[in-house]
């Protein structure tokens, strides 16, 4: 992965470590910021993430849908209070609309897209930060542009879903989007489940078995394990889960009854994957007072 100047800058801001050390850390960790912070900590170059208190883990998921095109954008703020601010919300909506119209493929491309004001997304972001006094981050972008049925669903501004369905109708596609929002399946179909996941689950199931069960004939043991794995696969695939709008049927049964096929989906939830910092104000006050 190319180590860009923006990645080096972000790591420097978070750790206070020199440019060359940051570049080396990013190179060692394939450009992953969080892994690079941990690498620097293990190397003794930094005791903690200096920008930890400025992590933008709140925010808004915005969906814009126009026929067979739809985009999903996550815009982060530091606090839930700012996530409800009118300036923040206006920025989030403008960014999502611009992403749809411009056809931006990723966040890096989106930064350079111009908004109706004439300023780029990145320039406007800087202005919003100056106005509200919190870090604001355009974190993720997903899009679907297809001749198939495309549905978009957002729940409370915190969860957003895009779904592409071949066949069926718009109502079915929207129902599937609502299901994905509620159940968060990691995979679409059985064929999408990774071999690594299956192997890991097999190891876990074997470790949970008693020595008596493990001593059973290989063919019987394989049937027991396969049964457990099949149950797990149903739980982690969209097609295997009971349909939230009709739990008596699986999603696969509902989709096939409509002569349809779910091509894929995208789901985002505000702040997922971001480690939130819990402040210990009592310890901080004692430290500043020289009592600890």
Swiss-Prot record:
Residues 79-82 are annotated as: Involved in Mg(2+) ion dislocation from EF-Tu. Belongs to the EF-Ts family. PANTHER family: ELONGATION FACTOR TS, ELONGATION FACTOR TS, MITOCHONDRIAL. InterPro entries: EF-Ts_dimer_sf, Transl_elong_EFTs/EF1B, Transl_elong_EFTs/EF1B_dimer, Transl_elong_Ts_CS, UBA-like_sf. GO terms for molecular function: translation elongation factor activity. It is found in: Cytoplasm. Gene3D superfamilies: 1.10.286.20, DNA helicase RuvA subunit, C-terminal domain (1.10.8.10), Elongation factor Ts, dimerisation domain (3.30.479.20). Pfam families: EF_TS (PF00889). This is Elongation factor Ts. PROSITE patterns: EF_TS_1, EF_TS_2. Keywords: Cytoplasm, Elongation factor, Protein biosynthesis. Its main location: cytoplasm. GO terms for cellular component: cytoplasm. Associates with the EF-Tu.GDP complex and induces the exchange of GDP to GTP. It remains bound to the aminoacyl-tRNA.EF-Tu.GTP complex up to the GTP hydrolysis stage on the ribosome.
């Amino acid at each position: 992965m190319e180590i860009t100047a923006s990645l080096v800058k972000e790591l420097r801001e978070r750790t206070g470590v020199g440019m060359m050390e940051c570049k080396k850390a990013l190179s060692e960790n394939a450009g992953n910021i969080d892994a690079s912070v941990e690498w620097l900590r293990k190397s003794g170059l930094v005791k903690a993430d200096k920008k930890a208190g400025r992590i933008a883990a709140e925010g808004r998921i915005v969906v814009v849908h126009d026929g067979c095109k739809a985009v999903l954008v996550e815009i982060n703020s530091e606090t839930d209070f700012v996530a409800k601010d009118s300036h923040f919300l206006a920025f989030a909506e403008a960014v999502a609309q611009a992403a749809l119209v411009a056809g931006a493929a990723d966040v890096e491309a989106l930064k350079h897209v111009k908004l109706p004001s004439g300023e780029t997304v990145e320039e406007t972001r800087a202005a919003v930060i100056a106005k509200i006094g919190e870090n604001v981050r355009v974190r993720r972008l997903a899009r679907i542009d297809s001749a198939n049925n495309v549905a978009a669903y957002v729940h409370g501004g915190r969860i957003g879903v895009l779904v592409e369905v071949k066949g069926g109708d718009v109502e079915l596609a929207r129902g599937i989007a609502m299901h994905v929002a509620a159940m968060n399946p990691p995979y679409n179909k059985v064929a999408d489940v990774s071999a690594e996941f299956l192997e890991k689950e097999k190891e876990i199931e074997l470790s949970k078995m008693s020595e008596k069960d493990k001593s059973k004939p290989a063919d019987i043991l394989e049937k027991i394990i396969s049964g457990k794995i099949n149950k797990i696969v149903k739980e982690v695939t969209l097609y295997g889960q009971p349909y939230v709008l009709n739990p008596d049927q699986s999603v696969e049964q509902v989709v096939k009854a409509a002569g349809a096929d779910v091509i894929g989906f995208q789901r985002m939830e505000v702040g997922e994957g971001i480690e939130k910092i819990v402040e210990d104000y009592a310890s901080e006050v004692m430290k500043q007072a020289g009592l600890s």
